[in-house]
Amino acid sequence: MLDTVWVVDPIDGTANYSAGNPMAGILVALIHEGAPVAAVSDFPLLGRRLVTCDGSPLRSVGGPATGFGGGEEAMGFDEARGHVGCSSHLPTDIFHELRETGLRPRMTGSVGLDNAFVAQGVFDGAINFSPHPWDNAAGALQIQAAGGVVTDPEGNPWTAQSRGMVAGTPQVHATIVDILSRHTGSFHR
C-alpha cells in the first residue's frame, strides 16, 4: 500500500439509498501510513456532515458536534439510551450478550452513519466487521476527534488493515471488546 492514499465510499449504505431510505452517505478519508489524517462524512439526505483533520476538533453541520465533551457523565454509559450501531453480520449470540448488558443494538444499514452517530453522541458505541478502510477510516478519525475510543474487534489500535472496528465511550467500548473476546473467530466474515 502507498504511504498516503485517499479512500472513498461514494454511497455508504447502498441498499438503503437504492430503496429510498435516507440513511446513506459519502465517506472520504486521507490515510497516511495506515492511519486516517483527514475525514469527511456527508449524509446529504439527512442534512448532516462531519469534518476533521488529525489533531483538530470535530466539526459538524446538521447535528451536534460531539456527545463526548460534556464531562464525566457524557463519557459514561447512559443506561436509558445505550444505543450501539451494529452490522447485520453480528452473530446472534453476541447481539443477545450486548442486550444483556443493557446496551441496545441498532442497525442503520450504514457503517458510516453508525460511526457518525457515535462521533455525535447519538449512539454510545458501534461495532462492525467490515475489512474495508473506506467504511471505517473517516469514522475512526471523527470518533477519536470527539473523544471516543476506536480499536479493531480484538481491542488493538484501528488501522486501515483492520478487519472491523469497535468504537464508543470508554465504558461501552470496553464492554463490547470484552464480549467479543469470548467469541474470538466467530465474527470474521
Predicted regions and their residues:
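N-terminal subdomain of lithium-sensitive/metallo-dependent phosphomonoesterases centered on the IMPase/IPPase/PAP
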Residues: 1-11, 178, 185-189
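Active-site glycine-rich loop that binds ribose-phosphate moieties when present
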Residues: 28, 67-69
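Short loop segments at secondary-structure junctions
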Residues: 31-35, 45, 54-57, 89, ...
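Detector for glycine-centered tight turns/loop "hinges" at secondary-structure junctions
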Residues: 34, 47, 62-63, 155
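Short helix-loop capping/hinge motifs at secondary-structure junctions, enriched
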Residues: 57-60, 65, 172-175
